[in-house]
Amino acid sequence: MAKLKITLVRSLIGRPEAQRKVVRALGLGKTNSMVEQNDSPIIRGMINKVAHLVKVEEA
């Protein structure tokens, strides 16, 4: 299964609680933190919810 490298590039300060929870569920914490996740429809949906906060690359 393909992997995605997800990096949090924008701060969560002032963001709605729902977006904060999605970022935490992806495994991200502070700005510039990076995590690798399997490419699945569930992860893609989570990325779409916070696309303006993260950068996604194929790993």
Swiss-Prot record:
Domain of life: Bacteria
Record keywords: Ribonucleoprotein, Ribosomal protein
CDD domains to which the protein is assigned, alphabetical: Ribosomal_L30
Gene Ontology molecular function: structural constituent of ribosome
PROSITE patterns: RIBOSOMAL_L30
An example Gene Ontology CC term for this record: cytosolic large ribosomal subunit
Database matches in InterPro entries: Ribo_uL30_ferredoxin-like_sf (IPR036919), Ribosomal_uL30_bac-type (IPR005996), Ribosomal_uL30_CS (IPR018038), Ribosomal_uL30_ferredoxin-like (IPR016082)
GO biological-process terms attached to the record: translation
Keyword Ribonucleoprotein in annotation: yes
PANTHER family: LARGE RIBOSOMAL SUBUNIT PROTEIN UL30M, MITOCHONDRIAL RIBOSOMAL PROTEIN L30
Annotated family: Belongs to the universal ribosomal protein uL30 family.
Quaternary assembly: Part of the 50S ribosomal subunit.
Name of the protein in question: Large ribosomal subunit protein uL30
Gene name of this polypeptide: rpmD
